[in-house]
Amino acid sequence: MPKTSILALSFAVAASSLIAVPDARAQSCGQLWYERNSIYKAAGYCFRTPRAISAFGNAGCTYDSEYDVPLSPWQRRRVADIRAMEREFGCPR
C-alpha cells in the first residue's frame, strides 16, 4: 500500500474516532433538554410540563420533586453540567 494511502487511511480512522466521541458543546438545546430529562425519567421523576409528559410520559413515576429523585453522583454532576450548558447557550427554560 503506498504511503499516501496509509496516511489517508490513518487520518480517516483518527477523524472518525473523534467524531464518534459525543461533544456536549455541539449538542442543541433540544438534545440537552432530552438528555437531562432522560436521566430524571430513568430515576422515576413525575414530569409536570406538557412537553416532558408528551416526550416521556409519567407511567411508573414515583418522585414529584426533582430534589427527591435518587440520582448517583455522576448523574447529579451530568445534570448540573447540562444545566450550565443550557444557561450558557441561552436555551429556553
Spans of features found by a protein language model:
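C-terminal segment of classical bacterial N-terminal signal peptides
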Residues: 8, 14-23
